[in-house]
UniProtKB/Swiss-Prot annotation:
Note on how the cofactor is bound: Binds 1 zinc ion per subunit.
One GO biological process term: alanyl-tRNA aminoacylation
Catalyzed reaction equations: tRNA(Ala) + L-alanine + ATP = L-alanyl-tRNA(Ala) + AMP + diphosphate
Gene: alaS
Protein name, entry field: Alanine--tRNA ligase
GO MF: alanine-tRNA ligase activity; aminoacyl-tRNA deacylase activity; ATP binding; catalytic activity, acting on a protein; transferase activity; tRNA binding; zinc ion binding
Phylogenetic classification of the source organism: Bacteria, Bacillati, Bacillota, Clostridia, Eubacteriales
Protein source organism: Clostridium botulinum (strain Eklund 17B / Type B)
HAMAP family the UniProt entry points to: Ala_tRNA_synth_B (MF_00036_B)
GO cellular component: cytosol
Length: 879
């Protein structure tokens, strides 16, 4: 066979179809664009849906690709079997209203038997039951053995994957056995036994399915083929599974080296090796496409894969973070086809390292708690872990539900998934209730949402801050009204307005509304569900009626400040991408008159030097006095021009593009200044994390930034005065004082420990016998956790057959420590169980091993009650 290596097979396929006048396209991102039906790209044709359905014009009627894909539907089987994987590459050639069955069938045969030189006697073909046309072309345009062609039903030879283009198909299979099927039943049996494996699927796309069994004919017939690169490599390299082909074997061997194990010697070890090998491929490619670990959507898929792989690394005995280095093998073997991997190598490694470290910090604690829960289940002869316990592991220790399930299944146990989801639902309801509002400024929200669809409201405020308009609707409280008078708080809807309604993170305009008979304040401007611009008005004097003509006047000074802040967010977005990398994407914003807030994707806290650089770049753009131009253009034209936008959102065909020279170009419907110089000054107030993988920057501009600088200067002046030093000497003076304080704190700690040690005899002498075990339960004051552990050790070492539980009240909180020697444990003493109940009495929580446990509490006033309970708890434990 001419080609065997995976990378060579990819090139051979793409080159073959280029020779057939196909346009070779790079793989699309794993993140679907403008397709809400998919979480991740899971098929070669998925990114090409708009071409198949006619929504977009393809760059050429013939296209070929090798598309990276991720499927997680079978994730629970990945590793358990050697067949399943989450990441794969799909070779494909596509025709959009050009060639059809007559061309693709002989081409497919030519590639497999001519280019790849596969033996014809090993190839089998299946076609859809009544597809006589396909049968004719196979028998007249190729030299396939007719006895190797089988007709199968819809389940096997009608391709559809959710909603979208679909149709009958023909599949080409490779036989790995000497057995020869005589009919379709025997063929299916051999196929189910993996003795004959599918290599290539040629889909004759004729329909657009809605995923519910309904089909419409497409405007023109299309071709969509898919051949899994890894599966093809299995055939060409004569391997038994995808984990043995060159690219995956390289990863698997590296994991084996790290864990000092070999593949094929132990089934349990093999499962872990396969899981890590597969998952690191998905992880690497997902991060390269700017997917960040999070608790929802595709970010959750990434987090689940990463944490599952990390857990199996620990199972194999790998102690340190390793996935961040294992991705080097993926990048090395795949970067020739996907150069972005090499470009983003350090970024990929960093994201993995941070997430891996974060999980490893909680993995041990979480596993300890889960192991205790498993022990309790087995002791009580129970098989199902409560949903509330599973949810706590997820909420506190970051254990995805699926990971908890997997660990439980290894022990022959299961999770109450319904209970888990109920806990999740309750948490979301609590969050939703905290946000929910039933009215706005005294006006019923439901009433606002049923304003007549016949009323048209037009925004004409980009160039105007004052307009004459006609009042179309009034809403006063819960009801529509014909008029409003002095003292009313109402909603006014007009036919036209210069007031910008809150949208895209920018707050609504305020100002005045008046005519000869009425004067009112516009306190806010929003849009209702129907898209009507609604003004929230406080009636100051006179009467306003439906049909009246009024003057609407925006508070221009306030709007100017909003415009400064909005343009500044664009400059900030651009600066963040330049400093932190192309993975940065807007995740939200808030633009008001006095400040701005910008949320963005990033995997760690922004370093101080990075923040300074970002701030510098924004101020450089401001000081460049660059004109800010706004242009209306087609959406596709805007994309092609390099304009930044959240393209998962829905845009109209015509969009506004706001451009600040070389500094920024974004799709935006908000209001902006006409020159960057008008911003004046930009200062960052804070940077912090608001969710996993999401950071937030708050900043001020113009006079607010000037005030901030002055306030900081005044603060420095006051601090230097208090410290009796110059402003330049403040840090050194504080360092000196901090050092002196630490020395004094150390002296105090030593003294406290000495005082506590003086009580050691009293503590030992307090021991009481409970069922043959010496129980010490004693309360101390102002002893920290470390000193308390030391005292516990002393008591344990001096009192045989003992369980010791000590408490200490420190700054209104309680520290608890318990230790038991081997003899006490052998009799049934269990520090973890004792301390768990004691901590509950003290308003806290904790746990641990039979011989040692720690906890904390918030109710020092209940220490006496808690200590009294120790004897009773031990009495129930000791048989």
């Amino acid at each position: 066979m001419k080609f065997t290596k995976t990378n060579d097979l990819r090139d051979a396929y793409l080159n073959f179809f280029e020779s057939k006048d196909h346009l070779k396209l790079e793989s699309f991102s794993l993140v679907p664009q403008n397709d809400k039906s998919l979480l991740l790209i899971n098929a070669g044709m998925a990114p090409l849906k708009p071409y198949f359905t006619g929504l977009q014009e393809p760059p050429k009627k013939r296209i070929t690709t090798c598309q990276k894909c991720v499927r997680t539907g079978d994730i629970d089987n990945v590793g358990i079997t050697s067949r399943h994987g989450t990441f794969f590459e799909m070779l494909g050639n596509f025709s959009f209203g050009d060639y059809f069955k007559k061309e693709i069938i002989p081409w497919a045969w030519e590639f497999l038997t001519g280019v790849l030189e596969l033996p014809k006697e090993k190839l089998y073909v299946t076609i859809y039951l009544d597809d006589d046309e396909a049968y004719e072309y196979w028998t007249t345009l190729t030299d396939v053995d007719k006895s190797h062609i089988f007709r199968l039903g819809k389940e096997d030879n009608f391709w559809e994957h959710g909603a979208g283009p679909c149709g009958p198909c023909t599949e080409i299979h490779f036989s790995r056995t000497d057995e020869v099927p005589k009919n379709s039943e025997e063929f299916v049996e051999l196929s189910d036994a993996d003795k004959i494996i599918e290599v290539w699927n040629l889909v004759f796309t004729q329909f657009d399915g809605d995923g519910k069994g309904n089909y419409e004919k497409l405007a023109s017939t299309n071709i969509d083929t898919g051949m899994g690169l890894e599966r093809l490599a299995v055939v060409m390299q004569n391997k038994n599974s995808i984990f043995e082909i060159d690219t995956l074997e390289n990863i698997l061997k590296e994991v084996g080296n790290l864990a000092s194990v070999k593949y094929g010697e132990d089934n349990k070890i093999d499962v872990s090796l396969r899981i890590i090998t597969d998952h690191i491929r998905s992880i690497t490619f997902m991060i390269s496409d700017d997917i960040m670990p999070s608790n929802e959507g595709r970010g959750y898929v990434l987090r689940r894969l990463l944490r599952r792989a990390a857990r199996h690394g620990k199972t194999l005995g790998i102690k340190d973070a390793f996935l961040c280095n294992l991705c080097d093998v993926v990048i090395r073997d795949c970067s020739s086809a996907y150069p972005d991997l090499e470009v983003k190598k350090e970024y990929i490694k960093k994201v993995i390292k941070i997430e891996e470290d974060k999980f490893r910090e909680t993995l041990d604690s979480g596993m300890e708690i889960l192991n205790n829960l498993i022990s309790e289940l087995k002791e009580n002869n129970e098989k199902v872990l409560k949903g509330a316990d599973g949810f706590k592991l997820y909420d506190t220790f970051g254990f995805p539900m699926e990971l908890t399930k997997e660990i439980l299944e290894d022990e022959g146990l299961s999770l109450d998934e319904d209970g888990f989801h109920e806990e999740m639902k309750e948490q979301r309801e609590r969050a939703r209730s905290a946000r929910k509002t039933s009215n706005y400024m005294g006006t019923d929200v439901k009433t606002l949402d049923i304003i007549s669809s016949e009323i048209e409201t037009t925004f004409d405020g980009y160039e105007n801050d004052s307009l004459i308009a006609e009042v179309k609707t009034l809403v006063n409280g819960e009801d529509f009204a014909d008029s409003i008078t002095e003292g009313d708080n109402a909603v006014v809807v007009t036919d036209v307005t210069p007031f910008y309604a809150e949208m895209g993170g920018q707050i609504g305009d305020t100002g005045t509304i008046y005519n000869d008979n009425f004067k009112g304040k516009i306190l806010d401007t929003k849009k209702n569900i129907g898209g009507k611009i609604i003004h929230f008005v406080e009636a100051i004097s006179g009467e306003l009626k439906v049909g009246d003509k009024v003057t609407l006047e925006v508070d221009n000074a306030r709007r100017e400040n909003i415009k400064k802040n909005h343009t500044a967010t664009h400059l900030l977005d651009s600066a963040l991408v330049k400093v932190l990398g192309s993975h940065v994407h807007q995740a939200g914003s808030y633009v008001s008159a006095d400040r701005l807030r910008f949320d963005f994707s990033h995997f760690e806290g922004v370093k101080e030097e990075e923040l300074l650089k970002v701030e510098q770049l924004v101020n450089e753009a401001i000081m460049s006095v660059t004109p800010v131009n706004t242009t209306e253009m087609d959406l596709q034209e805007a994309k092609n021009s390099g304009a930044v936008g959240i393209f998962d959102d829905k845009y109209a065909e015509k969009v506004r593009v706001v451009c600040a020279g070389e500094y920024s170009k974004e799709l935006c419907g908000g209001t902006h200044i006409d020159n960057t110089g008008k911003i004046g000054l930009f200062k960052i107030i804070s940077e912090n994390g608001i969710a996993a993988g999401t950071r937030r920057i708050e900043a001020v501009t113009g006079m607010e930034a000037y005030k901030l600088v002055n306030e900081k200067a005044e603060l420095l002046k006051q601090i230097s005065g208090k410290l009796k030093c110059s402003e330049k000497e403040i840090t050194s003076k504080l360092d000196q004082q901090s050092k002196e304080m630490k020395e004094k704190e150390k002296e105090i700690t030593i003294l406290k420990s000495k005082f506590a040690s003086m009580e050691i005899n009293d503590i030992i002498n307090s021991a009481k016998d409970v069922k043959g075990i010496n129980i010490v339960a004693y309360a101390l004051k102002d002893v920290d956790g470390e000193a308390l552990r030391g005292l516990c050790e002393k008591v344990r070492d001096n009192v045989n057959n003992s369980l010791t539980l000590l408490t200490s009240s420190v700054d209104g909180k309680v520290v608890i420590c318990a230790m038991a020697d081997k003899e006490a444990v052998s009799k049934g003493a269990h520090c973890g169980k004792v301390i768990k109940e004691v901590a509950t009495i003290l308003g806290g929580g904790g746990g641990g091993r039979p011989d040692m446990a720690q906890a904390g509490g918030k109710l020092p006033e209940k220490i006496s009650e808690a200590l009294d309970s120790v004897y009773k708890i031990v009495e129930t434990l000791v048989k």
